[in-house]
Amino acid sequence: MIQYFDKLSLETKGIIFMILSQFFFATNDAFIKHVLAFYKNDTSYLGEIVFIRGVFVIFFIGLILFIKKNLDLKFLLTSKHLLIRGGMEGICAIFFFLGLATLPFGDLYVLLNLAPIIITASGAILLKEKVGWRRWSAVLMGFTGVLIVINPTKLEFGFAFIFPLLAAAFITLRDTYTKKFEQRYDSIQVAFVTGFMVTVVFGIYMLFHFKAIKLDDIFYIFISAILLSFGYIFAVATVKIATISL
């Protein structure tokens, strides 16, 4: 099985990693949405929920790095590139979770589907990646699909729609920036600093919007953290081995 995987092209591996990352991200989001439902989607609870999840993420990914003997905190937490990328992820997470708390799950992901379209365009324009007519056709078909699902003629626009759109914009910035230093760091190292920065951002958010959650919800947050950790790792691996316009 491993030998077969090694023979695959980088683009094919990138597709597999992308599918896996989106699966882990979506499943993680479902758990967080489930927890938020206990509190009637009150965003005041977001800070503590995401902060606790972040602590679990840091511990889990940090444990992997420790086992691999690749956990150099001084190196990781003083890297300008990783901290900037992590900051982008933190801002993206804020907008995403505000959307998660105020929009139906399906609507949120439909709007987030704009991110791959924007990323493909940025890969061609900013990184000068070669994007042929087939890939541009896929971009246009994807955008058309988003419009069909959203159905603009019946959609009641509200302020909440701006949240996933801003999240999509920061996803684009994050991946474009990551591509510029892709080979300098291990995917798990990037995922660790990403988890750290998101935790810091929501720790600050929690200071101004704190509401205690129930201990019973910690289990769901823990499962969410494991899923998110793998999502981070595969998302970084995707950008490292394939063109971001993929």
Stretches found by the model and what they are:
Residues 1-12:
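Short, Lys/Arg-rich, polar N-terminal cytosolic tail immediately upstream
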Residues 14-20, 71-95, 159-167, 212-234:
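Loop-to-transmembrane-helix transition segments
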Residues 22-26, 30, 62, 86-94, ...:
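Hydrophobic/small/kink-forming positions within alpha-helical transmembrane segments
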Residues 24-56, 173-197:
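Juxtamembrane helix-loop-helix junctions in multi-pass membrane proteins
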Residues 41-48, 95-112, 183-188, 235-246:
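Structural motif at transmembrane-helix junctions in multi-pass transporters
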Residues 45-59, 98-115, 157-170, 214-228:
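Structural signature of hydrophobic alpha-helical transmembrane segments
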Residues 96-101, 115-137:
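C-terminal transmembrane-helix exit sites in multi-pass transporters
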Residues 134-151:
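Hydrophobic transmembrane alpha-helices of multi-pass small-molecule transport proteins
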